[in-house]
Amino acid sequence: MKGLAFSLLLSLVSPCPIRAADQLEVTFDGVVIPVDIKDLVAWGRSGGVSNTELGIWLDLLEPASRRGMLELLRAPLITNRSMARQMLDSWAGRRLLDEVADLVRVDDDTVGVTVLNTLEVLLSKQPHVTSLDLLEALPAKRVRLDLDGLLGVAEHWRGQLKHQQALVNRLDQIPITAVAPSQSISIDATTGRAPLSKALTVAHRPRPLQLQLWQPPAERFRSNARDRSWIVLMPGLGGSPDHFRWLGRLLSAKGWPVVVLEHPGSDSEAVGAWLQGRRRPPGAEVLPDRLKDLEAVLQAQASGSLPVVGNKVVLVGHSLGSLTALLAAGLRPQPGLERRCRKALDDLPLSNLSRLLQCQLSAVPLPSIEPPSQLLAVVGMNSFGSLLWPRTRPVRLSVPVLFTGGTLDLITPPLNEQLELLVATAPAPGSGAVVVQGASHFSPIRVEGQAGEGKGNDLFQLGEELVGVQPLQVQALLGEEIVAFLTGINATSSPAGPSLVHRQVGELHLHRMDPAGAASLLSGS
């Protein structure tokens, strides 16, 4: 048990820089336990060979625990100097460092300035930084680790994961209403009909926006519809129009013209530049330009300079693209965001990373843009906004919405985000949410080679641990649900269905719900 506790301590400490000054003071159950840092560093650098009192004590650990501690101490924490510097200089990086500083106190530094400065010095001298490097370099008279606080954070994380698992259990209890075999996926992301490319000059950017236009086949064009609609599709943070060729192709084949936006500064090129250490990671500060991108596309279509026919528009987005759509629809953060964020970010938000973007929005001035008068509906894949529009302060969205998500999503978990949003935005009739078991935040993204064995040459090198199970089947199900939603809102009347629907397609389970169904699931959380 002691070995397990000490391994936990080191696993939590190792990412946080501590200097081998004199002692590391560990606060545990109200008791301060001193650990000689010099002895700990010597033990780590020697590969576990040390005759000090601490070394003798550590020799009593189980071999697996000893190896794990040595690996944590000696493994590189930072392997890309430039990328790490940019991350530490970003809003999200500073916010995370601030939270870590509450748990690992260096002298009287409560905001992590000492840690940040030490990392900067180390990164200016060497390309890689290990825990041992930080232990030796951090200038401090006293370092205190609040193990009670760390255990509290871990308990909070476990609680959040239990809430998500409880949602899965409640979904499993809903009787299956339809069973179908797996769908045959015959269209790959790089084959079949290709989109048209269009460059759109905009006033707020130095270079034209690059758009993908998916025009319906002549025989499928919805020329008889009273309110002919078209679709604007916006990728998420680090996303590319090519990630959604499958959806553009599908929707245009069903009769809707589709325009897929590029968002310079928050697209795959921007995130790639961050990974190479050439810029800060993009965050919520990109939203004003994203909103202006969308406004420019809508104006170009209305003036006829964008060759897309339609009287009504549907805004579709993935992740940050979904948030862009909701803001464009007229929603603005409800008062009290900073207070809600102080509470939400009191623990490291690793089970809901979207909270960092939501909270950064309090420091971002949003442009004054009128909601498009021709707005027909909003579709948000892996959407988020529970801190912006909490259930306790609902805000009215005047058009139908469809939110989709997956049970393996720890960036925008469906229980906290899509279901909360559906209830909080009090949307128009016809609104709903779809949750796919085993799908993740990246399931809607199709990259080159995903249909085969390879991962392709793409920024998103996605394996099953990130993209979830059966991504092509998940995309087929999501496409089917989006088409059904769009067809329903165009219908003159549609009969009300059950609040909760459980479909099984092959091995996948899909759950569709209206706001009442979402509220009933949330009430059980």
Residue spans of the language-model regions?
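Gly/Ala-rich beta-loop-alpha elbow adjacent to hydrolase catalytic centers
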Residues: G236, V316-A325
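N-terminal cap/lid segment of alpha/beta-hydrolase-fold proteins
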Residues: D172-R226
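Cap/lid segment of the alpha/beta-hydrolase catalytic domain
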Residues: G238, D242-R245, L250, E262-P288, ...
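Alpha/beta-hydrolase fold nucleophile elbow
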Residues: L306-S319
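Alpha/beta-hydrolase active-site loop
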Residues: R280-P307, L323, L327, L337-N352
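Short beta-strand/loop motif that positions the catalytic acidic residue
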Residues: L397, F403-G405
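Mature extracellular/secreted ectodomains of secretory-pathway proteins
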Residues: V31-P181
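Short beta-strand element of the alpha/beta-hydrolase
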Residues: A225-G236
